[in-house]
Amino acid sequence: MRKTLRTLLVSVAVAAAGVLPVSTARAADGYDRCPDGYYCMFSGLDGTGDMIKLRGNAPDLAALGMDDRAKSDWNRTPSTIYLWSDAQYSGCTAVTSSGPTGKGNFFPTYQNFFSSVQFDGPGGPSCGTPPGEGR
């Protein structure tokens, strides 16, 4: 009886192992964490670190834990994104376009710099391109 039960249990275990799927998927990392249709900011370079994802305006990034912390971004929306140096859409602005140019690291001068995010403008005075930092 014991031998029959053990044989049955081994047979069931082998059959289950052949039926159960093996997951090889891995979690998204870096920029790939940003879902389509969102604008994402990252606290690290190249889409690393903490991430926030937005589908609309954010007048104060402090409320989202990203005030003066972002180092990279990806605009996966059809909108033009205006990044403001100060909260409540004040100070100067930099622009992140949609499409393939809307992904990357901020110029070193503008890392840990932005405090609010506005979708589709009107924008404000340009923060400019820092000398020697043309993309």
Regions found by a protein language model. Give the residues of each.
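Compact beta-sheet-dominated domain cores in extracellular/mature segments
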Residues: 2-11, 16-135
